[in-house]
Amino acid sequence: MGITIENLQVDDLHANPNNPRKQVGDIDELASSIRSQGIKQPLLVTPNGETDIDGHKQYRVVIGHRRLAAAKQSGLSTVPAIVEEMDARREREIMLVENTQRSDLTPIEEADGYQGLLDLGVGVKEMAEKTGRSGRFVRRRLKIARIPQETRDMSADFSQLSLDQLDKLAEFESDPDMQRELARADDFDWTYQRLCRERRKTAWHDKALEEIGRAH
């Protein structure tokens, strides 16, 4: 797989749909720095296999989404980039490692990043080794990643939920109705405690019925 360093048109560079980090955040300061000093560190991109109507190759950004956004805001037409051919697995590994090292990700973004690698066949042990995390850490994120989109859509602020809140949501994996109710709750902690009580009461009731059935 060849690697080159080139100056590429910003219009030929596209955000990676598999980037764990979904928002670039505030880029005003970075844009100001780029206007005065230029881009000091090249982006890392990979060809996406497409061309525009003029025949120019198109690329996916692997590292440098914030720099690209700031370059566009600064009015730059080209940016320096390292171009590397890579497969989907390597792309995801690089993006996840890069973002976790910078502590940029929200807990759910990080969880979805690990899930993306799992979908490509990367095991928990290998993910832990590549990101410098423990197996327990990775498994915890993967459990969070299983929270379905329907539940996530219950709250406009879902992406900002804390790790503790996401853990509590994941506890209701086997009860989608309760999970959705908790996701949309205005008072998350109070609702969590109430749902836990309801679940314990239901479990006690079911157990009592089972024992009565055995007695007969």
Spans of features found by a protein language model:
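Short, ordered loop/turn segments at secondary-structure junctions
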Residues: 48, 84-87, 132-133, 143
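Short, charged/polar connector segments at secondary-structure boundaries
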Residues: 1-84, 95, 100-103, 180-181
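Alpha-helical interaction elements
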Residues: 101-177
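Amphipathic heptad-repeat coiled-coil/leucine-zipper-like oligomerization helices
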Residues: 206-209
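Conserved small/polar residues in nucleotide/adenosyl-binding loops
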Residues: 215-216
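Extended amphipathic alpha-helical segments with heptad-repeat/coiled-coil character used for oligomerization
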Residues: 160-163, 168-198, 202
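Amphipathic alpha-helical transducer elements in NTP-driven molecular machines
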Residues: 24-27, 65, 89, 108-111, ...
